[in-house]
């Protein structure tokens, strides 16, 4: 403690001497090289806190109790969920490859976007050692087949191609750049999507929502307590049902496989060592029968079941984040998110944001300082203004600022800028926020 105090005193003296060499006008226009932010939580903060669900499960709460807590006024009831859901698994790309995995694996190729209910004659059936490369070209998709044991003729392009396989013996391995993902269920469609500027390849996996889709969700660790896994499965099913009514043209999908919607990782979730079976069993426990399962409802209809990783201690009132009131998204205490034992990474975090990123976020030539204009009732920032050395300024909502500078959340407690000066490496601006004092050394 004495050594640290001496170091801080020395740094303060050096910093004061350094400033004496700089005129007041120069000091006022110093442009920070970085900004440091301290905060808590991860995600938008609306709906169910996943860390909170884990914390409550550790306190022996049931899945229904957890869901009723985070979505007050709702009920967990049986609801039909035997629909097919179309999941975008690769988008805005030019090409992708597919292989069959399995000792007796084979793939069946169909020309066109074939509905799951139809079983036409395939364009071709190919052995498991065949690699199929699908390339977008001028608004069409061109398949090219290769194999160490066979030669294939060129195939004419078509707007879309469908691939199926026998899920009892085979999985489909999709390779997009360096990312390779296995899919066990349903079918995969490769389609060319055209917008005003160009065309690109969109790849989708169509499968049953009830079980096949949920088995592949990688939203939380499978090692978590059973009640937390069940709550996650029910919330995810509810969210997905809300996406079924619209096919999005830009992705040829109902839902994305990323955290834009829900993190769908395919067969890898089920095959996790030791714990994969726990997630599958948790999903199964939420079934009511073959064609229906537990869903969060209000007046008999599925809710918008938003969820996120962790909060700054209280979940958000949705009206303060996205502008429209929702009766079951009004915010509740979430102390589990601030427990570092169960939220090691985000109970308290710090991030450096480079000057270039701050300037780009505010669309200013540079940022010398910023002002937090307002906060939500939970303490997260709702409005922030960046100020340039030119005197220009720009204002962003808290959520937009978080997205642009890639901070974990809008629960920002403390900030400081780092300025490179002659004789000193760092400037430390000390702020006391909620009795927390942070300083660089």
Protein language model annotation of sequence segments:
Residues 2-441:
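Conserved, single-site charged/polar hotspot
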């Amino acid at each position: 403690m004495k050594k640290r105090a001496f170091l801080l005193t020395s740094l303060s003296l050096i910093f004061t001497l350094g400033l004496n060499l700089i005129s007041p006008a120069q000091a006022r226009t110093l442009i920070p090289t970085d900004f440091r932010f301290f905060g808590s939580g991860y995600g938008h903060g609306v709906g169910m806190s996943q860390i909170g669900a884990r914390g409550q499960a550790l306190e022996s709460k049931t899945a229904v109790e957890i869901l009723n807590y985070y979505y007050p006024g709702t009920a967990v009831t049986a609801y039909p969920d035997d629909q097919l859901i179309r999941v975008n698994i690769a988008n805005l790309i030019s090409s992708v490859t597919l292989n069959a995995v399995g000792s007796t694996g084979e793939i069946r190729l169909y020309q066109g976007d074939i509905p799951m209910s139809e079983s036409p004659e395939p364009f071709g059936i190919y052995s498991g050692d065949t690699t199929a490369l699908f390339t977008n070209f001028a608004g069409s998709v061109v398949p090219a087949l290769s194999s160490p044991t066979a030669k294939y003729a060129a195939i004419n392009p078509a707007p879309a191609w469908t691939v199926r396989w026998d899920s009892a013996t085979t999985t489909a391995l999709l390779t997009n750049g360096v990312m390779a993902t296995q899919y066990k269920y349903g079918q995969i469609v490769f389609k060319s999507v055209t917008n005003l500027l160009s065309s690109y390849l969109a790849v989708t996996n169509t499968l049953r929502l009830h079980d096949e889709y949920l088995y592949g969700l990688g939203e939380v660790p499978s090692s978590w307590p059973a009640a937390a896994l069940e709550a996650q499965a029910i919330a995810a099913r509810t969210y997905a049902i809300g996406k079924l009514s619209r096919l999005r043209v830009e992705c040829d999908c109902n839902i994305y496989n990323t955290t834009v919607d829900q993190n769908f990782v395919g067969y890898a979730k089920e095959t996790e060592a030791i714990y994969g079976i726990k997630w599958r069993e948790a999903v199964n426990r939420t079934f009511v029968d073959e064609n229906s399962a537990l869903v969060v409802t209000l007046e008999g209809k599925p809710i918008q079941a938003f969820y996120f990783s962790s909060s700054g201690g209280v979940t958000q009132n949705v009206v303060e984040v996205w502008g429209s009131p929702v009766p079951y998204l009004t915010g509740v205490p979430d102390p589990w998110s601030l427990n570092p034992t169960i939220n090691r990474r985000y109970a308290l975090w710090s991030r450096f944001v480079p000057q270039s990123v701050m300037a780009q976020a505010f669309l200013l030539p540079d940022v010398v300082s910023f002002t937090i204009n307002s906060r939500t009732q939970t303490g997260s920032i709702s409005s922030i203004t960046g100020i340039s050395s030119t005197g220009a300024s720009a204002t962003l909502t808290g959520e937009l600022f978080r997205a642009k500078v890639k901070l974990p959340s809008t629960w920002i407690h403390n900030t400081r800028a780092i300025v490179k000066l002659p004789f000193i490496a760092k400037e430390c601006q000390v702020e006391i926020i909620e009795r927390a004092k942070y300083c660089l050394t």
